[in-house]
């Protein structure tokens, strides 16, 4: 808030809780949360994965899933960014169309408010960018097709 003017310049206030006494409550001197997370992962002192995403509150969910897809499941960059995603925030869960309906039902049965998107690559998800570097210094990159620029993939 600009002193003397009393208004904010962007929608970052939507991440605060308007109710008093809660962890995310609005209050003097509090800064808004931002989720900008350009990230690099190293192994044996060498950069192995470089990744980030625009997408507001969905950034953290997307980056954890993309990174896990590469590190734990051995996916290529394209496979990692195009795999089905889930984003959870508060009591709401957004699932892309390709998330199995039995898993969606399980989330609903656990009391979650689930939105099962009609789209396989939903714009409710953040748009991850990813470069994976192998031991021979070959680059495998992908740009999430959920965004307007589509999918870019290069491997050399």
Per-segment meaning from a language model:
Residues 1-118:
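Proteins synthesized as precursors that undergo proteolytic processing into mature forms
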Residues 75-76, 92, 102-120, 124-156:
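Terminal-appendage/accessory-domain detector
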């Amino acid at each position: 808030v600009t002193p003397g003017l009393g208004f904010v310049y962007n929608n970052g206030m939507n991440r605060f809780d308007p109710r008093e006494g809660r962890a995310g409550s609005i209050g003097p001197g509090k800064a808004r949360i931002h989720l900008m997370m350009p990230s690099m992962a190293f192994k044996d002192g060498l950069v192995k994965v470089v990744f980030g995403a625009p997408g507001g509150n969905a950034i953290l969910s997307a980056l954890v899933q993309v990174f896990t897809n590469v590190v734990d499941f051995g996916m290529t960059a394209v496979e990692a960014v195009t795999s089905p995603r889930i984003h959870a925030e508060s009591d709401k869960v957004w699932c892309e169309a390709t998330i199995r309906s039995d898993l969606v039902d399980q989330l609903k049965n656990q009391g979650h408010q689930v939105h099962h998107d009609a789209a396989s690559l939903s714009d409710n998800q953040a748009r991850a960018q990813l470069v994976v570097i192998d031991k021979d210094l070959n680059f495998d990159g992908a740009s999430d097709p959920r965004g307007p620029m589509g999918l870019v993939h290069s491997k050399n």
